[in-house]
Swiss-Prot record:
Lineage: Bacteria, Pseudomonadati, Pseudomonadota, Alphaproteobacteria, Hyphomicrobiales
Protein name: Argininosuccinate lyase
Organism annotation: Brucella anthropi (strain ATCC 49188 / DSM 6882 / CCUG 24695 / JCM 21032 / LMG 3331 / NBRC 15819 / NCTC 12168 / Alc 37)
Any one Gene Ontology BP term: arginine biosynthetic process via ornithine
Gene encoding the protein: argH
Single Gene Ontology MF annotation: argininosuccinate lyase activity
Protein family according to the UniProt entry: Belongs to the lyase 1 family. Argininosuccinate lyase subfamily.
Swiss-Prot/TrEMBL keywords: Amino-acid biosynthesis, Arginine biosynthesis, Cytoplasm, Lyase
EC numbers, comma separated: 4.3.2.1
InterPro entries documented for this protein: Arg_succ_lyase_C, Argininosuccinate_lyase, Fumarase/histidase_N, Fumarate_lyase_CS, Fumarate_lyase_fam, Fumarate_lyase_N, L-Aspartase-like
Length: 466
């Protein structure tokens, strides 16, 4: 009978037999939560130091625990640590190895602690550290866009709505649109860090502990602003993981929109940009091909990240307080999303910096599709005092005439324009060039080159403080 007893010495006391092989397989998380080894050891070191300072464990026990944990950290980092599925997770793998190294003193480490608050602090530490990495990556991407925006503040290109030519803008203005998007992403990252900057360590299983622990001490040691204020919520909460996935999904959406534009712009039909060899691949059969695979893969990774968010939302949606084993399924979603977001941001920063901009193609396209029609309507309002709706109607007739003649608006004769509205003068022709159009958009946040440069100056100052 003793041979049948559970082999897990961490919780096996009340069990008469060990788990079925299938139970062992479905219960084990060491295949993925080993990624938390550094955070688990970090949390245990802080917990042990606090136990010693408060007199809960002896100084000698603390010394042995600390030395043992540092040895384990080195073993893992050197690839010499053997992970066991029978021990389920990273917490018990480390604790079992600690017992091998230092003996009975290892059993004192878990005093006033549960795996519930242990995994909560490990995971929160990991997400917090990952958010800091995401912030740094986003800053790098924003800086890449600022460089290109400054370089092309006056480079004219078509602006689109419905992917149809709308009005001329500058490429610098287009770049600054992405600075705004990724700037909001960076702001969300900073907000998330601020919200999650509390330590759940010391909440124990769910109700706190009767030992005289110092949760403020461990929170400070682990780099948190303060401890969490409710032990039940502390072990139940995965909002920080959901928030990470949410902001990752929003950011991935921005990356995907950018990737789509790069894919379109790099086609021979558009010919706005040329991708560097460093971020392209070729075809195994068609020698002429230069494929935007990096951009396409960034676009595709959005699906994975969105899927991770939906998965964790679904996992958490009906769980009663406090901890349920369902929550073991939280980590793979976050790990996968973090890895793919980091890679996608880095790839996009590289692509943006390496893009060759075809200024001539952009300018030519900017003048097509009657892109200065709005400028004609605005002129009619300013110079002739027409209500905008009437000016819109007059301009629409001018566009229809130009289409029938198969010419641009600026190529219509004064007589043809006056046949639509007799008040039009030859002064209008100075307003129908793409350069004049973009220069006229001087409103705050507009596409005029001087306004683009002003926004660049603002963001350069802001990003240094982000």
């Amino acid at each position: 009978m003793s041979e049948q007893k559970s082999s897990n010495q961490m919780w096996g006391g009340r069990f008469a037999s060990g788990p079925d092989a299938i139970m062992e397989e479905i219960n084990a998380s060491i295949g993925f939560d080993r990624k938390l080894y550094a955070q688990d050891i970090q949390g245990s070191l802080a917990h042990a130091a606090m136990l010693a300072k408060t007199g809960i464990i002896a100084a000698e026990d603390h010394r042995q625990i600390e030395d043992g944990l540092k040895t384990i950290l080195k073993e893992i980092e050197d690839g010499k640590f053997t992970f066991s599925r029978k021990l389920e997770d990273i917490h018990m793998n480390i604790e079992a190895r600690l017992a091998d190294l230092i003996g009975p003193s290892a059993g004192r480490l878990h005093t006033a602690r549960s795996r519930n608050d242990q995994v909560a602090v490990d995971f929160r530490l990991w997400v917090k550290q990952e958010l800091e990495k995401t912030a740094a990556a986003l800053k790098n991407l924003i800086e890449a866009f600022l460089e290109r925006a400054e370089e092309h503040a006056a480079t004219v290109m078509p602006g689109f709505t419905h992917l149809q030519t709308a009005q001329p803008v500058t490429f610098g203005h287009h770049c600054m649109a992405y600075v705004e998007m990724f700037g909001r992403d960076l702001s969300r990252v900073r907000d998330a860090i601020e919200r999650m900057d509390e330590s759940p360590l010391g909440a124990a299983a769910l109700a706190g502990t009767g030992f005289p622990i110092d949760r403020h001490m461990t929170a400070k040691a682990l780099g948190f602003r303060e401890p969490t204020r409710n032990s039940l919520d502390s072990v139940s909460d995965r909002d920080y993981a959901l928030e990470f996935l949410s902001l990752a999904a929003i950011c991935a959406g921005h990356l995907s929109r950018l990737a789509e534009e790069i894919v379109i712009w790099s086609t021979p039909q558009f010919n706005f940009v040329r991708l560097s060899d460093a971020f392209s691949t070729g075809s195994s059969i068609m020698p002429q091909k230069k494929n935007p695979d990096a951009a396409e893969l960034v676009r595709a990774k959005t699906g994975r990240i969105n899927g991770s968010l939906v998965a964790l939302l679904t996992i958490m949606k009906g769980l009663p307080l406090a901890y349920s084993k369902d929550m073991q399924e939280d980590k793979e979603q976050v790990f996968d999303a973090a890895e793919n977001l980091e890679l996608a941001i880095a790839a996009m920063a590289g692509m943006v910096r390496d893009l060759t901009i075809n200024v001539a193609s952009m300018k030519k396209a900017a003048g097509s599709g009657y892109s200065t029609a709005t400028d004609l309507a605005d002129w009619l309002v300013r110079e002739l005092g027409l209500p905008f709706r009437e000016a819109h109607h007059v301009t629409g007739r001018a566009v229809a005439l130009a289409e029938s003649r198969k010419v641009d608006l600026a190529k219509l004769s004064l007589e043809e324009l006056q046949s639509i509205h007799p008040g039009i003068t030859d002064a209008i022709f100075g307003y129908l060039t793409v350069e004049k159009s973009v220069k006229s958009r001087q409103s705050f946040g507009g596409t005029a080159p001087q306004e683009v440069r002003r926004q660049i100056r603002y963001w350069k100052k802001r990003i240094t403080k982000a």
